[in-house]
């Protein structure tokens, strides 16, 4: 039987998913092969129910199996990622949103932390995963560097109990490694760490799970993205052209045919500088409205503009995110960002789905 299954897989390996150089077997789209007595049946897994290539791929599979292996009957069950069972830990998670940046140093983790707090203050149930494996900063920003998550048994399976601070459930690799030691891991190790935190955490009911991704679009970054189910992605940038150029790469990655994750919009961080002694003044030290212009060009939302103010730095250093003070100017900026993100997720109509990275 194994030899027959291998023959079928070898033939189906000749079927390329349209628009990519990868076969449907390499993309793990072929499952549950059964064959015998002139009949073969298997399951084809597609990302979306409205995939325009469903018919063409099925037709090609049927033709090749009849031509090369002589099957008279080919039965193909078509299923979509939305229909597949979620991992136990994510069964009650409504939306998973990636917070990303094409470039380091643009304040992505600061935005992710304060967005999580703002969503929690708006009444949502929120979780935050620090997937920046090589530079985890969430424990510091939430003032819980000394926290030690423990294991709990849920449904006969051991899961990690997240740390809870300011109404946000938190998991970070920073809780499990020496803060003074460099994390020198290859891609698979980093991917496994993320998967363990996301699918091995006891998240229970969440309206939003935010994933603070590493900066960039490297192979490790793409591997991390494909291990989780995403409702959408947020791209953080400063107004500078050097940062915007990398933001474009991030947008293109999420919108590429092999990933197809909705980009909810852009966040312009460090939009302007306002000194404490001159609260009405705005100094555009990194340029003006760069992210707004990029959002317009790409047909995306500008989800928020976050200024540079001293309290953001102080909040990050002290473990007290500025979004906790929702009546302050900067707190209001993050509350507006939270409202816009919630609206954008609702408008996409996308529930969490897995992605497969192709080249």
Placement of each model-derived feature along the sequence:
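Walker A/P-loop phosphate-binding motif and the immediately C-terminal alpha-helix
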Residues: 96-132, 259, 266
